[in-house]
Amino acid sequence: AYLILGTEKTVMLDTGHFAHWHSLPRQLHEMLQGRTLDYVFVSHQEIPHTGNLGRLLQRYPQAKDVGDVRDYHLFHPELTLSRLVHMRHGEELDLGDRRIVFLDALWKDLSGTMWAYDTKLKLLFGADAFGYIHQDDENICATMLHEMPKDLAERASERAALPFFGLRQRTEICLMASMPL
């Protein structure tokens, strides 16, 4: 799960596994610092990504679930349709100082999988498409984003080849996020 704080709006990308709910409310409270959660984006309907969606939307009754939400009324019949906002490829959320652009996933873990792109950080949230990229001598998985080596994106390309091409729009990607780092 990731939390993005814009100057005007906030969005949580993926909600984490329901087994981690015990720590999520406290962490969100600390990170939001009195602000509210405006949006929740779930990349796809798999438990590690959507496990806390119902509880989050219950805790933040003004928050809207955005993304490919065509089936979500079946999973969460308690939600009003006004809280489910279907986003299409290329549509954006304006958070103030940054935008989140929704993209059709090139690799779909499940039908309805979407990716998100943060225009400020130039960061692609690629659901499960890219896996973990690190060498055994580096403990990248236990590192916070701000602690990571500045050249991580360049070095990652030395160790992984992405077997696809043909993005519909050219986007500068400085970092890729697959799962929490």
Model-derived segments and their meaning:
Residues 63-113:
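Metallo-beta-lactamase
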Residues 77, 105, 111-115, 126-129, ...:
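A short secondary-structure junction signal
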Residues 20-65:
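Active-site metal-binding motif and surrounding structural segment of the metallo-beta-lactamase
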Residues 20, 45-50, 72-75, 91, ...:
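Active-site environment of divalent metal-dependent phosphoester hydrolases
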Residues 132-181:
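Cap/insert and terminal regions of metallo-dependent hydrolase folds
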Residues 1-30, 115-118, 122-126:
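Conserved beta-strand hairpin/beta-sheet module of binuclear metal-dependent hydrolase folds
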Residues 13-15, 37-45, 65-68, 124-128, ...:
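Active-site neighborhood of phospho(di)ester-bond hydrolases with catalytic His/Asp-centered motifs
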Residues 26-28, 55-58, 79-82, 138-141:
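Short, glycine/charged-enriched secondary-structure capping and boundary segments
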